[in-house]
Amino acid sequence: MRKLNVSNLACYRSGNKIFSDISFNLNEGDVCLLSGSNGSGKTTLLRVLAGLIPISYGSIEYNNMNTLEDNFYILGHRLGIKEEVTPYEDLLFWSSIYNYKNFENVLKRVGLKNYKSLKCKYLSQGQKQRLAISRLLVSKKSIWLLDEPLSSLDKEGISLLKELIDEHNKFGGIAVISSHNDFLKKYDFHINMDK
C-alpha cells in the first residue's frame, strides 16, 4: 500500500519562517487539502514536497523512502506552455517523456480535441489550464501536487477536475491540493496554513 508520511516539516528562507510543524499521513486514495491566505506557505509546502525547495527540518517519506523521487507530478502557477506549439504538439512531447500512448484521448477528455491544431497562444487561460491538467493524466504519477488548480477554470472545468481527482484517488492515487475555493466537498486531511 502506498503511503505518504510527512513529519514535523519546516521551511525557513533567509532566516524567516515560512511554515513549521506540518505533519500528516496519507494512504493511497487520500486527498489532503491545503487552505490559507495568500503568503501562508501553501505553494512553498507543495514545492518542498516536490523537492524543489530544501527541507529545513522534518521528514518526508513515501513508501519508506526519504523522497517522493519520480512518483509525483506538480501542477503549479506557471504552466510552462509554449505559445507557438499546438495542444497536440504539447501533449505529444509530454507523452513521449512519460511513454503514454493514447494522448489524443486525453485531449478529448479535457475538452481540447477541437482545439488540438490551434497554436496555444490563441487558447483562453481556462483552455491552457485544461492543457496543463492533461499532463497530469499522461504522467501516470501516483502523487498529484496541485497548486490552486482551479485557476481560470469555468464551472465545467472545475467539475472535470473534481472528476479526474476522484478517479485518481479511486485507483490508489494521492493528491495534495492547495485551494481558496471549497470545491472539494470530501477530503481526508485538511491543513489550514494560517494556524
Question: At which residue positions do the language-model features occur?
Answer:
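Conserved ABC transporter NBD signature motif
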Residues: 55-70
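Catalytic Walker B motif of ABC-type/P-loop ATPase nucleotide-binding domains
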Residues: 144-148
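Conserved structural motif at the start of ABC-family nucleotide-binding domains
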Residues: 4-6, 18-21, 153
